[in-house]
């Protein structure tokens, strides 16, 4: 049965198109523009590399801990559900969810901090902007242009992942100069759903992994205002449930509560502001997709709790320091010895110093955790994270 979209949903038939005209010579199959965007993401090398990029745990001891790839799939599942209920475009939502983490360097935020420092005199590094740089420049499988030539709506949604942008960095400015994305306005509801779905998945699945790893205490978790009502509901329904099944039920229930809260709040905002069409969404005074005030407050408190108790856990810090060392040494090595770069990266060696620094960071940022260690062993010497 064909979905009846809301009047303010993104419509592939009304897409602003792609930067490069692809013509009609190739067989496209029965796919609309946003479905093709999604498929290009899934078939990209950058997407495949997410399998070996860290979510929380570097060099995890268990095969069940999440990585960027599994996180992206979970974000997409949540995003499609929310989009379906709100009668938005599921295909664009899914594509944005799948692509949102492509710009993460090896070892996650640890690696990002090193790359920011490496480019401090060349415009800095931001993983959100780097996602777009990958998709518009670095990932280049086509014969007539660089990048995946994604739709305007896809690029806009990735650029404004967290809302309007007043001061874009160099990487985002380059994309905007080539294909103006109206950076100071709000993105589509589909992009807003993707961002919220990332928060829901991030909070719950990192909690799941942290509990399973024994790094955070369940009693402290269930005392958090975000989790306490869910815990009470689960314990009332299943008073004898323990262990892994108890954690699984807690996570399942918490995701549902956050999804339902976001649906109620988004409907309330739409009813109040009364947008008719997609251009109205872009000119709204605030995001249309979001949590209630209480959920927003509790979710922020929970993030603070997770940073203190999980992301900066003493067991993780020594590995994080070693990972930082690996990335910083690799950047320094290729800066001093660019001939150690792969041949295709040497062939595209820039003429000026700023672009050379960015070129090296592009290469290192594209590495997986595994490949960064492999290149360190190959080019510098033996080194173990744990």
UniProtKB/Swiss-Prot annotation:
Domain HD: 68-203
Gene3D superfamilies associated with the record: Hypothetical protein af1432
Keywords linked to the UniProt accession: Hydrolase
The organism's place on the tree of life at top rank: Bacteria
Pfam families noted in UniProt: HD (PF01966), HD_assoc (PF13286)
MF terms in GO: dGTPase activity
InterPro entries with a match to the protein in the record: dGTPase (IPR006261), dGTPase-like (IPR050135), dNTPase_2 (IPR023023), HD/PDEase_dom (IPR003607), HD_domain (IPR006674), PHydrolase_assoc_dom (IPR026875)
GO biological process: dGTP catabolic process
SUPFAM superfamilies per record: HD-domain/PDEase-like
Keyword Transmembrane annotated: no
HAMAP family: dGTPase_type2 (MF_01212)
Alphabetized NCBIfam families for the sequence: dGTP_triPase, PRK01286.1-1
Family to which the UniProt record says this protein belongs: Belongs to the dGTPase family. Type 2 subfamily.
Name of the protein: Deoxyguanosinetriphosphate triphosphohydrolase-like protein
């Amino acid at each position: 049965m064909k979905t009846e979209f809301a009047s303010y949903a993104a419509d592939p038939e009304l897409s602003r198109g792609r930067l490069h005209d692809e013509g009609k010579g190739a067989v496209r199959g029965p796919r609309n523009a946003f479905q093709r965007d999604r498929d290009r993401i899934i078939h990209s090398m950058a997407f495949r590399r997410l399998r070996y990029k860290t979510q929380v745990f570097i060099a995890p001891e268990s095969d069940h801990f999440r990585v960027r790839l599994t996180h992206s799939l979970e974000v997409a599942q949540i995003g499609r559900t929310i989009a379906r209920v709100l009668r938005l475009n599921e295909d664009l939502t899914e594509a944005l969810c799948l692509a949102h983490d492509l710009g993460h360097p090896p070892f996650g935020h640890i690696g990002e901090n090193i790359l920011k420092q490496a480019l401090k005199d060349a415009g800095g590094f931001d993983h959100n902007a780097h996602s777009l740089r990958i998709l518009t420049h670095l990932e280049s499988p086509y014969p007539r242009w660089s990048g995946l030539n994604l739709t305007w709506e896809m690029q806009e949604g990735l650029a404004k992942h967290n809302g309007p942008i007043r001061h874009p960095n160099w990487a985002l400015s380059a994309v905007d100069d080539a294909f103006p994305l109206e950076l100071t306005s709000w993105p589509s509801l589909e992009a807003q759903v993707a961002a919220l779905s990332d928060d829901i998945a991030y909070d719950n699945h990192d909690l799941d992994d942290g509990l399973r790893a024994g790094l955070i205490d369940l009693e402290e978790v269930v005392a958090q205002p975000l989790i306490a009502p869910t815990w009470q509901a689960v314990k009332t329904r299943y008073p004898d449930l323990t262990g892994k099944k108890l954690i699984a039920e807690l996570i399942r229930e918490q995701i549902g509560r956050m999804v339902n809260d976001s649906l109620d709040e988004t409907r309330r905002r739409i009813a109040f502001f009364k947008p008719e069409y997609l251009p109205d969404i872009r000119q709204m005074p605030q995001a249309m997709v979001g949590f209630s005030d209480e959920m927003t407050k509790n979710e922020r408190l929970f993030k603070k709790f997770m940073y203190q108790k999980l992301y900066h856990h003493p067991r993780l810090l020594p590995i994080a320091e070693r990972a930082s060392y690996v990335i910083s040494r690799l950047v320094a090595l290729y800066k001093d010895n660019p001939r150690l770069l792969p041949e295709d990266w040497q062939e595209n060696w820039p003429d000026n110093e700023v672009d050379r620094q960015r070129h090296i960071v592009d290469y290192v940022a594209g590495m997986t955790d595994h490949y960064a260690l492999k290149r360190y062993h190959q080019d510098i010497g033996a080194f173990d994270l744990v």
